[in-house]
Amino acid sequence: GWEHDLTYEYLRGPLTTLLGPIVEICAPLLMEDLIRKKGMFPSRVRRFCTQELKVKPMQRYLAGRQDAGEELINAVGIRAAESDSRSKMPEWEWQDGFDCEVWRPIISWSEQQVIDIHRRHGLAPNPLYLLGATRVGCWPCIHARKSEIRLIADKDPARIVRLRLLEDQVAVAAAARAERDGREFTRPAWFQNPVSRSVDGKRDGLCWPIEKVVEWSRTVRGG
C-alpha cells in the first residue's frame, strides 16, 4: 500500500502477462493506517514497517502453503552491489523465520546483466526507473536518498502532500503522549536525522518536516 501506483500497474500488467498470475500479499493495516494506529513513524531503531508490512504477511502466506504440504523456496531478487549488507549474503541459505530455503539467483549479477535479461525477454523495466529512480520500493522509504526525495518532489508532489498530512496527524498523537507522560513535545517527522550537523559527525536527533527535507534535497552535496 506504500508503493507507487505505477509499480502495482507493472505487476498486474507486463509482469502478469509474461509470468502468469501473481499473488499479492497484504497486511491487515497498510502503511498510513499502521502509522496512525501507532502514532509514530518507523525509524532506524523501530523499523516496524518491514516487520508488519513485509515479513509477517509473507510468513503467514508461506505457512499456509507449507501447511498444505508444499515444499517452498523463497526466491529474492537482490544484488550484492546494492549495499554492504547484501554483499555479505550467500546465494543459498536456510531462513528460520520463513522455515524454508532462500535463493538469491542474481546476487552476483551486475546492473547491466539485469538490464540485458529484460531486453532479452522483451520486458520493459518498472516505469519508475524510466522516471529516474535508482531503486523501486516504498515511495518513499524512511531511508530514501537525497536524490530519491528530490525525484518524488518533482515527479509526484501529491505524495509530499500526503506525507505532510500524515505528519500533522501523527503530531496530534505524539503531543497527547508527551502531555500524558510529562515530557517535552517533539514534533515527529517522516525523515528523522536526514543529515548530520554536529562537529563529530554524529546525527543530532533533529526531525525535519517534509517541506524542509524537500528543500534540502535540492541543495548541492554537503548542503
Language-model segment annotations:
Residues 1-121:
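ATP-dependent adenylation/nucleotidyltransferase module used to activate substrates
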Residues 126, 131-223:
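ATP/NTP-dependent adenylation/nucleotidyl-transfer catalytic domains that generate, transfer
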